[in-house]
Amino acid sequence: MGAQLCFEANAKAPREALRFHAEAKGAQVRLDTRGCIAHRRTTFHDGIVFSQRPVRLGERVALRVLREESGWCGGLRVGFTRLDPACVSVPSLPPFLCPDLEEQSPTWAAVLPEGCALTGDLVRFWVDRRGCLFAKVNAGCRLLLREGVPVGAPLWAVMDVYGTTKAIELLDPTASRLPTPMPWDLSNKAVPEPKATPGEECAICFYHAANTRLVPCGHTYFCRYCAWRVFSDTAKCPVCRWQIEAVAPAQGPPALRVEEGS
């Protein structure tokens, strides 16, 4: 498929946070500036993405499902590959991780069970020293997705933003606290966010309209959904790193954080 194995890759890669590889991605994938969010623009395929470095045995790859899209069958696929994404010929990437990339290269992946990749879900997956691919969704039980992953050479994480899964975000599993599933998801479903016109997209999801202001810095590059997510997770503006004290419509009074128990 035009890709090659790069076995000289250092299996003991620096312990930098995982990001998506900036170049090796499906034709429909758009990444944010940090390389942490992958959004599939159209169709239900061509959503393959890779980690930017090899993943150690037992290392958890943590991600969150940011958005779903109805009308398709099937969703997120996850796994590992011996393909160094730096050596992948992007035009030759197939539209599907399962089974296309598996059949064309040393790649081992699986489909998450139905109902295990919903908007707001936290997904962790890893391979152990016996070559077993596991996943865990939120606080659920460990799931054995498949066996027989060879572990004698460097392995990169590979994901497919497929079907009903529209956007995912890589998280840092070593952080002191992983974010909980987003409590504002139901309210967002009740009041759908408007789709953006070209040039007015949210800087995080690249889909909804940038209609929300962060207080006090005043940056307005985000939709309501993503602004509240950032407020809950880090409370720091992604643009200027100022502390966020409130979230407001682009025009209107600020909405303050709701404290637990209030």
Curated annotation (Swiss-Prot):
Q: Which GO terms describe its cellular component?
A: cytoplasm; early endosome
Protein induction: By hepatitis C virus.
The protein's role, per its UniProt record: E3 ubiquitin-protein ligase that plays a role in various biological processes such as lung development or innate immunity. Seems to utilize UBE2E1. Promotes innate antiviral response by catalyzing 'Lys-63'-linked ubiquitination of IRF7. Also inhibits hepatitis C virus assembly by directly binding to viral E1 envelope glycoprotein to disrupt its interaction with E2. Plays an essential role in TLR4-mediated activation of MAPK pathways by promoting 'Lys-48'-linked polyubiquitination of the phosphatase DUSP1/MKP1.
* ZnF start-end (RING-type): 202-241
Q: In which pathway does it act?
A: Protein modification; protein ubiquitination
Q: Tell me which UniProt keywords the record has, alphabetically.
A: Cytoplasm, Host-virus interaction, Immunity, Innate immunity, Metal-binding, Transferase, Ubl conjugation pathway, Zinc, Zinc-finger
Q: Where in the cell is it found?
A: Cytoplasm
> Quaternary structure?
(Microbial infection) Interacts with hepatitis C virus protein E1; this interaction prevents E1 interaction with E2 and subsequently inhibits viral infection.
**Domain of life (superkingdom):** Eukaryota
SUPFAM superfamilies referenced in this protein's UniProt entry, alphabetically: RING/U-box
Q: Where is the chain membrane-spanning? A: none
The EC number(s) given in the record are: 2.3.2.27
Q: Name one GO molecular function term.
A: ubiquitin protein ligase activity
Q: Name one GO biological process term.
A: positive regulation of proteasomal protein catabolic process
Q: What is the lineage of its organism?
A: Eukaryota, Metazoa, Chordata, Craniata, Vertebrata
What this protein is called in its record is E3 ubiquitin-protein ligase NEURL3
Q: Which Pfam families match?
A: Neuralized, zf-C3HC4_3
Start and end residues of each NHR domain: 17-173
Spell out the CDD domains in the cross-references: RING-HC_NEURL3 (cd16552)
Main localisation, per the record?
Answer: cytoplasm
UniProt cross-references to InterPro entries, sorted A to Z:
B30.2/SPRY_sf, Neuralized, NHR_dom, Znf_RING, Znf_RING/FYVE/PHD
> Would I find Transferase among this entry's keywords?
yes
Q: Which reaction does it catalyse?
A: S-ubiquitinyl-[E2 ubiquitin-conjugating enzyme]-L-cysteine + [acceptor protein]-L-lysine = [E2 ubiquitin-conjugating enzyme]-L-cysteine + N(6)-ubiquitinyl-[acceptor protein]-L-lysine
Note the Gene3D superfamilies from the entry: 2.60.120.920, Zinc/RING finger domain, C3HC4 (zinc finger) (3.30.40.10)
